[in-house]
């Protein structure tokens, strides 16, 4: 395998981390007490030329865990009725087990070592994901315990915007505000945004790194 081909592997792009786009809709801001209501996950892949693309999607409506808190302000914001039977909600345990099975498979197939959460304002989603994994008592958590890729920060650097809708529009993506705050829609837009930023950096010559050129242009 040539050096160029090696750089075009997903495992070599993010130092063996397997990027997984996550969006979580919740019934509040406290990951230990407030219910997770909806989770969407999108895996990513790199083509033979090293361009990043969306791959597979998982999407679950979640039943509030026993004893969890439902904040009225939160559900008024995301417009989720936690107890509507038409949601087709499943248990948090089943959702998390399905997610981790998918992530572990991707890590293995892509030759990576662990998953890394990609999210918009990633601290929020990462905290809720870690709390949910802890609640369902899964010991082998494939995700990095604290490192994330935050598209709010990345888009602030790339296009000068940190709000998801504004960042998408600034980079040339459409955004439907009527679909916002759905975990599925927001994860799709976050994945599109992340891929655009990564691919734009590559297109500008930022990846793969030219070590000699980087030393000459160092500040």
Curated annotation (Swiss-Prot):
Q: Which residues form the Exonuclease domain?
A: 20-194
- Key words of the record: Exonuclease, Hydrolase, Magnesium, Metal-binding, Nuclease, tRNA processing
Q: Does the keyword Hydrolase apply?
A: yes
This protein's GO cellular component annotations are: cytosol
Q: Which residues form the active site?
A: 181
> What exactly does this protein do?
Trims short 3' overhangs of a variety of RNA species, leaving a one or two nucleotide 3' overhang. Responsible for the end-turnover of tRNA: specifically removes the terminal AMP residue from uncharged tRNA (tRNA-C-C-A). Also appears to be involved in tRNA biosynthesis.
Q: Please give the PANTHER family that the UniProt record associates with this protein.
A: DNA POLYMERASE III SUBUNIT EPSILON, RIBONUCLEASE T
Its name, as the record gives it, is: Ribonuclease T
Q: Which organism is it from?
A: Buchnera aphidicola subsp. Schizaphis graminum (strain Sg)
């Amino acid at each position: 395998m040539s050096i160029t081909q090696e750089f075009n592997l997903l495992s070599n792009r993010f130092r063996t981390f397997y990027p997984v786009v996550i969006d979580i809709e919740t019934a509040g801001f406290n990951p230990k007490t407030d219910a997770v209501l909806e989770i969407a996950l999108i895996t990513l892949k790199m083509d033979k030329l090293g361009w990043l693309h969306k791959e597979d999607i998982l999407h679950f409506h979640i039943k509030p865990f026993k004893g969890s808190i439902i904040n009225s302000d939160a559900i008024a914001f995301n417009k989720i009725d936690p107890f509507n039977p038409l949601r087709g909600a499943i248990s948090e345990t089943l959702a998390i087990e399905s997610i981790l099975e998918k992530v572990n498979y991707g890590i293995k197939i892509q030759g990576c070592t662990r998953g890394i959460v990609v999210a918009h304002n990633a601290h929020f989603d990462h905290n809720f994901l870690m709390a949910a994994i802890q609640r369902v008592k899964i010991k082998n958590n494939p995700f990095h315990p604290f490192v994330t890729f935050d598209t709010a920060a990345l888009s602030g650097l790339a296009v000068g915007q940190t709000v998801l809708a504004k960042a998408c529009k600034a980079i040339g993506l459409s955004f439907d505000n009527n679909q916002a705050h759905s975990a599925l829609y927001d994860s799709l837009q976050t994945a599109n945004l992340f891929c655009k930023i990564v691919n734009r950096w590559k297109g500008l010559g930022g990846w793969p790194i030219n070590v000699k050129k980087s030393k000459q242009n160092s500040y």
